[in-house]
Design a protein with these regions (language model features):
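Active-site-proximal helices and loops of the catalytic beta/alpha 8
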Residues: 1-103, 137-141, 152-228, 237-252, ...
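Surface-exposed loop/edge segments in extracytoplasmic proteins
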Residues: 260-264, 343-349, 382
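C-terminal beta-strand-rich structural cap/linker in extracellular carbohydrate-active enzymes
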Residues: 265-293
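Short strand-edge motifs at loop-to-beta-strand transitions and within beta-strands
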Residues: 269, 279, 356-362
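Glycine-centered coil/turn sites that cap beta-strands in beta-rich domains
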Residues: 298-313, 317-337, 358-364, 377-381
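A glycine-anchored, Pro-Gly-centered beta-turn/N-cap motif
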Residues: 251, 356, 368-371
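C-terminal tail/sorting-segment detector
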Residues: 347, 351, 361, 365-391
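Beta-strand-rich interaction surfaces with strong enrichment in secreted/lumenal proteins
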Residues: 268-271, 348-352
Length: 391
């Protein structure tokens, strides 16, 4: 380690030949197997392994963490190396990540060492979570495979050294009952859906233009594939700033998270961004995700006039799923599960429900695959959602 293993990362033709031989033997048995290497050798060696069909981990933790914490001097928050094209790779075989079993959690770093200016403080839990949302917007939208670590989608903030680096880490299911963490989860979900549904976010043919190294913390990614263009801008500083979006063309552009449209007549007209704020603009309409995922408002701002039940997540699911309900008053409330034939199979709550937003887990271990109905009833009001259990 350190000074005595520098040879391990140097270009080694024999090692390349051995790994290629082993990969070929594996693929003779099953050609669909993914071979993923935690390798970290010279880039020239990794290119040969990637060209042969193997996937390689790409550690971008330091740079994403610096961006998240708000530190940008000397290009330290430039995470462009997390894109395979920036390394000169011809194939999208770089598995980039900002957290892993060996790297500290972004939320822990935000809460411990986050920057601040005036009333804006990244060490504040709400601000820290919003910073991870911004990281996600500049992570999932870059073409190429990605890796997220356990509970990173919920803002895992236990240190890697708690209780020790190699110890089992606490499994914090209670995060699913935290309103702010659920909004982070759904933000990641919405970003992943972009990758799944629109080739511009995942195709190896996408033209990627990145401006990520500014000491101001202002960052921009431009994506272009055929007639689809996307511009992502974000302010990773702790003060308000403006940025040139450098749109591809004049005309109508759409903001993904709000669904709002904007007519652009000046490609370089500056856009003002609050600290931690970002936008994903596309020249084609995309159905926006759930409202208010990026809002800094408190939970009470989103309470409905009566009761409300959100779509469960995940869905489809196996064997358990989470159901979020909201109420603006204290009323006798029941949350029941019915099968497709209308038979009551489970009751999650039947009690006086205190005003607020709460999340309940339904464990369907003993139930067969199929469509189930979750029905929320309070007084004369009843609302339902469909859920799909697939075993």
């Amino acid at each position: 380690k350190g000074s005595n293993d520098a040879w391990g990362s140097q270009f080694d033709a024999d090692r390349i030949e051995l790994l290629q031989r082993m990969a070929d033997q594996i693929w003779e048995i099953d050609s669909t197997i993914y071979i993923v290497l935690e390798h970290f050798a010279e880039n020239a060696e990794e290119i040969e392994l990637a060209d042969h069909g193997m996937l390689l981990w790409g550690n971008s933790q330091y740079n994403y963490a610096e961006a998240s914490m708000g530190y940008h001097s000397n290009g330290k928050s430039d995470f462009s190396w997390g894109y395979y094209g920036s390394r000169g790779w011809g194939k999208p075989h770089l598995v980039s990540y900002f957290e892993s079993h060996d790297e500290e959690r972004l939320m822990y770093k935000n809460l411990s060492w986050g920057s601040s200016a005036g009333d804006y403080n990244i060490k504040d839990i709400h601000t820290a979570i919003s910073r991870v949302k911004a990281v996600g917007a500049f992570f999932f939208t870059i073409p190429g495979p990605k890796m997220i670590w356990q509970f990173g989608e919920l803002g895992y903030d236990n240190s890697i050294d708690d209780p020790c680096r190699l110890c089992e880490k606490p499994i914090l299911w209670a995060y699913f009952e935290d309103y702010e963490r659920i909004r982070l989860y759904k933000t990641f979900q919405a970003l992943i859906q972009l990758r799944q549904q629109y080739p511009v976010f995942n195709s190896s043919n996408t033209e990627v233009d990145m401006d990520l190294g500014s000491s101001t913390g202002m960052k921009r990614i431009r994506l272009s594939l055929n007639n689809e263009q996307v511009v992502i801008i974000g302010n990773f500083n702790v003060v308000n700033q403006s940025m040139d979006p450098n749109f591809y063309h004049t005309g109508t552009w759409y903001d993904y998270f709000t669904g709002d449209s904007t007519f652009i007549s000046d490609l370089n007209e500056l856009i003002n961004l609050d600290p931690g704020q970002f936008h994903i603009y596309s020249n084609f309409y995309i159905d926006p995700p759930e409202e208010n995922l990026l809002s800094a408002q408190t939970e009470s701002s989103f309470l409905p006039n009566t009761i409300e039940i959100k779509q469960n997540y995940p869905n489809p699911f196996n064997p358990s799923t989470f159901i979020q309900i909201a109420s603006n008053g204290d009323k006798q409330t029941s949350l029941q599960i019915f099968d497709i034939n209308g038979k009551l199979v489970d009751t999650l709550i039947d009690q006086n429900f205190i005003s607020g937003i709460n999340t309940y887990q339904w464990n369907a271990f003993s139930f067969p695959s199929g469509i189930y109905i979750a029905r929320l009833s309070s007084g004369v009001t009843s609302k339902s959602i469909k859920m799909l259990l697939v075993k």
